[in-house]
């Protein structure tokens, strides 16, 4: 029987890895046939690799790496110190690598909430990387722009009474955006990426990553179709948080494409 086409790290859609990863030699190291050799010991202060395995998706097979970053632990807000890199292809030493830094959104990504575009942005990023056969999604566990799930749902309740996403946070005494990108910068450094093509609509994210030493060769828009529930939220991000997106008052957005 002919084996399935594609191997881990290639954007072949239905391709599967030829062999699952196995432990060899020193148990402190994980070895994969794709030649991704990842130590479980500390990479830099506060950052550790905990696990690695190929994960088949409808967009191709990604290598999933689980990083533990102690500096992001906020148990009072329910934030996790464990972050994920989904890697397709050999990105080490590469320039202009398509990359999305994506923050966790339980409400949309698990339960299908229509109040934001997070789920669609994540899906679009994976699809684009799959088409290119090379790229990275960094999934940061900082729910609700870093305020945690409980505070996010409290903000949702205020939004139900007519407050936008910014005012809801402020009424609760919370910052507009509490996210930090130190884990993302550390993961990019560990993966050996020279420079990135960042998928984002958020200029503040660009500035924050550059301040942490990440080389951003270009920025590409991450715009997906809106809906009547997400349009007010996205409009608030455009008008009050400086996101580079078209006006969505009509409830419609554009397809993912390169920014100027």
Sequence positions of predicted segments:
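Low-complexity, intrinsically disordered or signal/transmembrane-proximal segments
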Residues: 10-12, 31-32
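General helical secondary-structure elements
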Residues: 14-15, 234
């Amino acid at each position: 029987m002919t084996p399935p086409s594609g191997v881990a790290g290639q954007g072949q859609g239905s391709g599967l890895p030829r062999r699952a990863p196995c432990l060899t030699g020193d148990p402190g190291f994980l070895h994969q046939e794709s030649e991704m050799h990842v130590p479980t010991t500390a990479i830099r202060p506060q950052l550790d690799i905990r696990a690695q395995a190929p994960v088949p998706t409808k967009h191709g097979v990604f290598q999933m790496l689980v990083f533990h970053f102690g500096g992001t632990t906020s148990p009072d807000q329910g934030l996790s110190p464990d972050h994920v890199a989904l890697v397709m292809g050999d990105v080490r030493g590469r320039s202009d690598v398509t990359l999305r830094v994506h923050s966790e959104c339980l409400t949309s990504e698990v339960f299908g909430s229509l109040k934001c575009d997070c789920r669609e942005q994540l899906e679009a990023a994976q699809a684009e990387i799959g088409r290119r056969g090379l790229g990275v999604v960094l999934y940061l566990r900082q729910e609700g722009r870093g305020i945690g799930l409980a505070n996010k749902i409290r903000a949702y309740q205020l939004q139900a009474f007519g407050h936008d996403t910014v005012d809801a946070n402020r009424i609760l005494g919370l910052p507009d955006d509490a996210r930090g990108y130190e884990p993302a910068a550390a993961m990019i450094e560990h993966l050996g990426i020279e420079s990135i093509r960042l998928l984002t609509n958020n200029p503040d994210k660009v500035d924050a990553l550059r301040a942490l030493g990440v080389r951003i060769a270009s920025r590409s828009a991450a715009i997906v179709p809106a809906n009547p529930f997400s349009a007010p939220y996205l409009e608030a991000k455009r008008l009050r948080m400086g996101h580079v997106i078209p006006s969505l008052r009509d409830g419609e957005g554009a397809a993912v494409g390169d920014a100027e």
